[in-house]
Swiss-Prot record:
It is found in: Secreted, Extracellular space. It holds the Pfam family Trypsin. GO terms for cellular component: extracellular region. The active site is at 26 (charge relay system), 119 (charge relay system). It comes from Lucilia cuprina. Belongs to the peptidase S1 family. It catalyses: Preferential cleavage: Arg-|-Xaa, Lys-|-Xaa. This is Trypsin alpha-3. The keyword Secreted applies. Transmembrane segments: none annotated.
Amino acid sequence: NSGGVLVSVAAFKNHEGYNSKTMVNDIAVIRLSSSLTTSSTIKTIGLATAAPANGAAATVSGWGTTSSGGSIPSQLRYVDVKIVGRTQCASSTYGYGSEIKASMICAYTVGKDSCQGDSGGPLVSGGRLVGVVSWGYGCAAVNYPGVYADVAALRSWVVSAANSV
């Protein structure tokens, strides 16, 4: 509720291959109307060049609800999760199967997840942006990891779009 910086968006670019039915390429780039000054609460982050290993520690943050149908929090929240590799996420261990595509990465820890309102937020692992909150079945549903746009897989598009938006 306090201490933040409000900056308007000057322009944005959605991935041309985004599909709202399959959620493939669920990523966009924004250009702010003014520059941000780095500080103790505003920092830059590098883009992942490779997907983190299955089981790697990660953190997702956002302003979303803390449960399905819940209310929006007054403070930025975060939760620690573990990376679930694409092959494992699409396996029979979890409930998604073929819905998991090459432009997606998953993260799961029992009882912890991103939720409504977190979409577009960061998934960070190893000090790099590895994912962008995309979709999932409910929030923290058993055997349904959170699904994220895979930054490493989409990195070349992000870099190109950032230079042209």
